[in-house]
């Protein structure tokens, strides 16, 4: 049987000093016989997705202690991508993922914790904690803060979210009053932004990986049902500890749950629900921490045969996360995929012996359990609040329409092409990604003129100054992990293209990335990035570029000889922006840039460089 890791600091005469310090935290004699379970919380008043988490760590802690464990809570940082968007603050967002992963490792290993409960929610926090969990490979369970309710206003016929507020603000025809109304209505409650943006996508994928309870990705932050997820997480982590440390059951370890097939399941779900392209970046990073050989080619392979079964904002205005929950949440999407033969159902989870068992219990179209049906009727109250579990509103009915509802069957898919695609070509030899769920079919094949910008800031100025015309392909480069540094999100450029009426008339290509709120022909993660010698750095104004989503290709329409000649010239100049950007790159950001890999590797640290130290 494996010993508790915590015995390192709690047992033996020589650990008297450490035990004295543990006692100073409130531990008693009997506690030294129990597993010490770390609670990695991410409460902060800066982020609406985390503002309600302050007391939830102790809610879990009390349940852990009732179940026979010792709970010790600590906090990680959390960056709000929406607030950091459009200025130098966005340089820090992706690097914060590595800081979060490291901070969890530091706390858990420094104090020899036996297991972890990860209380996450927003864009980089769930991925960072996931990376740490797979790196540490001790019992873990995730429980997120949950999505916010969609916004409501008399001026719009659909639910609102952050992106609506950004688009209307850039629309010169909109009155100040209308902009203010959208601003005040778009984000009414605590929780992660209400569409299938990065935060909600990742919380859903953690369910598919098997590391979270059903409902983790879709139960509203404000709903009282979410409290049960936190309580159950506390009980479950103690049970996982007993199985591993008491019964030598290694099947409960995160690397044995989130194995290669589980990563395929998670990516299959992502493609089926049209999730954020950022999820690709984060799954690739997490796979490396788990030492799993899961890469962009696997994602490309899956994207070619997985249909789109769910369409949610920003891909469609009709549905938000509250509607996904009403339709049965993630296990109903997994159920549709399983019945279509597209899912590995024999894999364990933290709550069921197998995915198949979980689907049988939690898919609303497969179970008659009234408690499950009641759970998925949890809905929005429409009352602005920053308080968790503050309302108990329920829909009168479920959305179990698999022909025309929010979630579809494989036979009635929104499209037989999934919601994400990987493109390759001479402009992105190692690949780039596009969220096809948000691209109008009329522009799945698009040939246009390159309009070059060497920073997000200059592209925004150019778009707002009407420099971009119909038929242009806006290229924003030197915004990758190294070149930014930090691989900024390009939500403002894509939102402003929409506000200018160019959403279906232009494309955008970047070695940066996109917010989960992005839609339109927006292609990111071009690899290698410009700063690493990628061909995106060789494109010139006016060059023709051909994007062909059906054939998964993207090419600069010049000869190989011309491309090679340009590379020779660029090598002489150096791979950096032509003009010096007014951007303060601190020591912290330089350290990230020094080790960062391109997006096709998940923008993680270059371990080969570190192994040589």
Curated annotation (Swiss-Prot):
The active site is at 515 (proton acceptor). Its cofactor is [2Fe-2S] cluster; Mg(2+). PROSITE patterns: ILVD_EDD_1, ILVD_EDD_2. Binds 1 [2Fe-2S] cluster per subunit. This cluster acts as a Lewis acid cofactor. [2Fe-2S] cluster binds at residues 122, 193. Keywords: 2Fe-2S, Amino-acid biosynthesis, Branched-chain amino acid biosynthesis, Iron, Iron-sulfur, Lyase, Magnesium, Metal-binding. GO terms for biological process: isoleucine biosynthetic process; L-valine biosynthetic process. Its EC number is 4.2.1.9. This is Dihydroxy-acid dehydratase. It comes from Pseudomonas fluorescens (strain SBW25). The gene is ilvD.
